[in-house]
């Protein structure tokens, strides 16, 4: 049996779960179905900029209640330019290809620094025995996030860097790696991911067509063997 945990809320803190997560959506689902969703999706965004992270404790509580946790990371680009730390390509000047080609650069070291910060948070989940569906660097082929703005080779190199650092340097073994690059040309390889996913979007088309796209996502070829 699963019962959604009651997350503590600090109404005086604008960055607390009161503005990020109040479980309102969960209660709405329960009010209609009489049951809570089994899976909770959380984001580690802005840990790398010094913002306090509530997602880790929420993940632990959700796991203790019998739920499944999936994490993504809207990574604020590690640029050295003031005011340009953002995950959207159009709002940052960070060049992934250049950073990867220059391991001694501040930009490359920024990549490692941010990954290490996230690893410290993920380590807390490993110590608590929480398995995570880890979905980093998502929707890369769309180009709207900086990690996809330099093309598939740079993206694959960044994925490999992250995978190696998290797995071999930090020893994280509680991560189930989810590839969500949206395009077979961007695939990171069977040895570096466990699950393949896709994000269909509803724009101005038919809602019925959107539903069938979502329901039949397993028919889309999103990777090559």
Ranges and model annotations:
Residues 12-19, 26, 31, 165-225:
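Surface-exposed substrate-engagement region within the catalytic domains
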Residues 31-36, 63-64, 126, 189-191:
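Flexible, charged surface loops at secondary-structure boundaries
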Residues 2-4, 45-48, 75-78, 138-142, ...:
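Solvent-exposed loop/turn segments at secondary-structure junctions
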Residues 1-43, 56-60:
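N-terminal module-boundary/linker segments of secreted carbohydrate-active enzymes
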Residues 45-161, 165-168, 172:
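Substrate-binding cleft of extracellular glycoside hydrolase catalytic domains
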Residues 19-22, 52, 111-115, 213-216:
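A conditional alpha-helix N-cap/helix-loop micro-motif detector
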Residues 37-43, 68-73, 132-136, 176-179, ...:
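Structural recognition of the beta-strand scaffold that forms the well-ordered cores
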């Amino acid at each position: 049996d699963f019962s959604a945990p009651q997350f503590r809320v600090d109404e005086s803190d604008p960055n607390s779960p009161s503005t990020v997560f109040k479980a309102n959506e969960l209660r709405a689902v329960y009010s209609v179905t009489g049951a809570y969703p089994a899976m909770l999706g959380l984001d580690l965004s802005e840990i790398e900029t010094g913002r306090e992270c509530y997602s880790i404790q929420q993940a632990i509580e959700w796991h203790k209640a019998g739920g499944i946790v999936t994490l993504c990371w809207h990574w604020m680009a590690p640029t050295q330019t003031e005011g340009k730390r953002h995950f959207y390509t159009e709002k940052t000047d960070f060049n992934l290809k250049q950073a990867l080609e220059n391991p001694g650069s501040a930009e490359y070291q920024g990549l490692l620094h941010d990954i290490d910060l996230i690893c410290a948070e993920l380590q807390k989940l490993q110590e608590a025995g929480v398995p995570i569906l880890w979905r980093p660097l998502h929707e890369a082929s769309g180009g709207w996030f900086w990690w996809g703005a330099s093309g598939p080779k740079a993206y694959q190199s960044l994925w490999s860097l992250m995978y190696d650092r998290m797995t071999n340097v930090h020893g994280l073994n509680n991560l189930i790696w989810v590839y969500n690059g949206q395009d077979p040309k961007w695939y990171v390889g069977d040895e570096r991911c466990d699950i393949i996913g896709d994000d269909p979007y509803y724009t101005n088309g038919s809602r019925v067509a959107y539903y069938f796209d979502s329901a039949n996502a397993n028919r889309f070829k999103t990777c090559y063997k």
